[in-house]
C-alpha cells in the first residue's frame, strides 16, 4: 500500500492520479485540512478524489489544532516549520491507525517537483543549490517514522506536471489551478493568523481567481486557441 499527503494542488493531485491509475485502492490519500486553504477548496478536493478516482480517501479535520499552534506566531519561516511539523503528526497518526487495522503502509508518495528541491538546496542537487526557503514536504520524517519514498515528479517542472495531469484525465480546474504554497494562507498573512484575517483573505483570493479565470477564458475565445 502507498500513502499520499494530498493537498489538492497540482503536484500532489497529479501524483495521486498517477498512483490511482497504477494501483487503485492500494493508494491511501490523506487530505489534512489545516483550515488555511482557499475558499471552498476542501470540498472541491474531496469531490474530485472520491468521485473520479477509485482510491481510499481520508479527510483529516485538523483546523482547530493548527489554529492553536499558530496563535500569535508572526515569523513566516516559523509558520512554515509549525505547519510542516504538525502535518507529519497528523499524517503519522493516520498511518498508525491504518497499521492497527491490519493494513500497514510501506510506501509514501510525494508531489515533490524539481523547483522544490532547488529552492530548498536539497539532496538531489548534489548540495550545489543554496537554500531559498524551506518546503514542508522536504522536512525530514519525525523520529521513528519510516516509509520508502516515491517521488515520481522530482525531475519535473510545473509545466510538465500540468501536461501530465491533463493526460491522466484530471479536471482543468485542478490542472490549471493557480500556484499555492503548501503552508497555505498562513504565510500570505502578515503577522499573526486570526479567523478574521483568514476570512478576508479567502474572500479576496476568490475574487482575484474568479477575475483571472474570466480573463483567461476571454483570451482563449479571442485568440481561438
Give, region by region, the residue ranges found by the protein language model.
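Core structural elements
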Residues: 10-18, 64, 110-117
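Generic structural signal for well-ordered, non-membrane alpha-helical segments
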Residues: 12, 38, 42, 76, ...
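Short beta-alpha connecting loops at secondary-structure transitions
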Residues: 29-32, 70, 74-79, 144-154, ...
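Conserved beta-strand segments of alpha/beta enzyme cores
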Residues: 26-28, 56-58, 148
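ATP-dependent adenylation/pyrophosphate-handling site
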Residues: 2-6, 10-47, 139
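Mid-to-C-terminal catalytic subdomains of enzymes
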Residues: 110, 115-120, 148, 152-225
Amino acid at each position: 500500500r502507498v500513502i499520499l499527503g494530498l493537498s489538492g494542488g497540482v503536484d500532489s493531485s497529479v501524483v495521486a492520479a498517477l498512483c490511482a491509475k497504477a494501483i487503485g485502492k492500494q493508494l491511501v490519500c490523506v487530505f489534512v485540512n489545516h483550515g488555511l486553504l482557499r475558499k471552498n477548496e476542501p470540498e472541491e478536493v474531496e469531490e474530485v478524489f472520491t468521485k473520479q478516482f477509485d482510491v481510499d480517501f481520508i479527510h483529516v479535520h485538523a483546523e482547530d489544532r493548527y489554529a492553536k499552534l499558530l496563535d500569535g506566531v508572526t515569523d513566516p519561516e516559523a509558520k512554515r516549520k509549525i505547519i510542516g511539523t504538525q502535518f507529519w503528526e497528523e499524517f503519522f497518526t493516520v498511518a498508525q491507525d491504518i497499521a492497527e487495522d491490519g493494513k500497514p503502509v510501506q510506501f509514501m508518495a510525494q508531489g515533490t517537483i524539481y523547483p522544490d528541491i532547488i529552492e530548498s538546496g536539497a539532496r538531489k542537487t548534489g548540495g550545489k543549490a543554496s537554500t531559498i526557503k524551506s518546503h514542508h514536504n522536504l522536512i525530514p520524517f519525525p523520529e521513528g517514522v519510516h516509509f520508502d519514498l516515491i517521488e515520481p515528479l522530482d525531475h519535473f517542472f510545473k509545466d510538465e506536471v500540468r501536461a501530465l495531469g491533463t493526460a491522466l484525465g484530471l479536471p482543468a480546474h485542478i490542472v490549471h489551478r493557480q500556484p499555492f504554497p503548501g503552508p497555505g494562507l498562513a504565510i500570505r498573512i502578515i503577522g499573526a493568523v486570526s479567523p478574521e484575517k483568514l476570512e478576508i483573505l479567502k474572500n479576496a483570493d476568490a475574487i482575484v481567481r474568479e477575475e483571472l479565470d474570466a480573463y483567461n477564458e476571454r483570451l482563449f475565445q479571442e485568440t481561438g486557441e
